[in-house]
Structures are given as C-alpha cells and as structure tokens.
Amino acid sequence: MNKNVVIKSLATLTILTSVTGIGTTLVEEVQQTAKAENNVTKIQDTNIFPYTGVVAFKSATGFVVGKNTILTNKHVSKNYKVGDRITAHPNSDKGNGGIYSIKKIINYPGKEDVSVIQVEERAIERGPKGFNFNDNVTPFKYAAGAKAGERIKVIGYPHPYKNKYVLYESTGPVMSVEGSSIVYSAHTESGNSGSPVLNSNNELVGIHFASDVKNDDNRNAYGVYFTPEIKKFIAENIDK
C-alpha cells in the first residue's frame, strides 16, 4: 500500500474514539454490518496478561509501556488534561486495577497519532494489588517487527460507556506494513482508539487509531506501526 493512502483516506475513516452526537449513529450502523474479519472475544478476566497492560479512558483505550506511563492517540489525549483520570484494565462491574490521575501529556512531534501519558504512581482508588500503579499493571514489550499475513490482535474498550467497560479482543491478518503505517483486517469500533496492536506472542507492533467507514469485504483497520523513531520517542518519555 502506498504510504499516502492512509493519509488521503482520513475523510473516509472512523476515528475510533467513542463519542456522542452527530455521526455516531452512522458509524455504529456501518460497523454492525461490517464484513471485515469479525473474530471478537469478550474478555472474562482482565487481571491476567496481556489484559493487565490495557487501560480505559472514558471514551477510548490506552496501554502501558513503562513505569507510570501509558500510550494512546493524540486525538484521544487532546480531550484530556492533567488531573483527569484513567482506569487500569476495568472489567465492567467486576473490578479494575485502580484509578489514576494524569500528570503529564506528551504528543509525538510527527504526523503519527501517538501520545504518551504519564500518571501519578499512587492510585486515587486502589487496585487488587494495592495503590501502586506499577503493581497493578503489566507493561508491554515490543515485537521485532511485523509483516503481511501475520495474525494480530487488537485489545480495547469498544463503546466503553454503552458496553459498561467490558474488554474485547479482536483478531485478524496484517494486510500491509509500510513506514509507520500498519493495515489489518480486524473488527474495531468506536472506543478502540489507542488499543494495542499485538502479535501472537502478545508483543507490541503498533497502536490502533481508525478504520474504514464502508461496508464491503475490503474494510480495513489502521494503526501506527512502531518504527525505531517512535520507539525512541516513547523510551525518552517514560516516567523516571
């Protein structure tokens, strides 16, 4: 795929933050009838890896990349500020890994939809392993790479409010990897923005940000592929 396709297609993509208002109904109707590979599993236990690496915003998803540090999309973090809260791997009304306050937001300087968020180490509301963020979550490690045909999974909180913060895992094949773009055929919905894109070993290959708004067999989902430059930016902004 030409690396410009994703950029030029933004007008026809769903930016996958759960929102209310104009456009939401259209997106939901399209996604309910999508023909993209629809291998979606409801996660029963979020207190085991890889699910302990995922966090929920009120309208989107993020994941842990290091000490007190999570990753999401710029189009997610722009709606948040220092002092706002995130919840570690909630499992609807069955508990969570604690609630934490945002202390710093750092956006990637390039065009890629990547944002680092640091949180306060001590929880506002404790998780099952106490008040320390790092005791209640598990950071992801990077994959060596990814290529077309490999299987990936996207883990996140589609329609988090509507679905009462139930975690879902969607799987499918990689369609292409070029530059900082990874394209895959996996069913995603509003709220999946910021979800980790993982290989079969639960290693990070990218971060999810959008999907096509169309109803045919070629409907794809899009992520930012973790290039060395993006990995370097993330490493430099892990909380010390």
UniProtKB/Swiss-Prot annotation:
InterPro entries: Peptidase_S1_PA, Peptidase_S1_PA_chymotrypsin, Peptidase_S1B, Peptidase_S1B_tx, Trypsin_dom, V8_his_AS. GO terms for biological process: proteolysis. It is an enzyme of class 3 (hydrolase). It is found in: Secreted. Residues 1-36 form the signal peptide. The keyword Hydrolase applies. The keyword Signal applies. Its EC number is 3.4.21.-. Keywords: Hydrolase, Protease, Secreted, Serine protease, Signal. Pfam families: Trypsin. GO terms for molecular function: serine-type endopeptidase activity. GO terms for cellular component: extracellular region. Gene3D superfamilies: Trypsin-like serine proteases. Belongs to the peptidase S1B family. Serine protease that cleaves specifically after the sequence Trp-Glu-Leu-Gln. This is Serine protease SplB. The gene is splB.
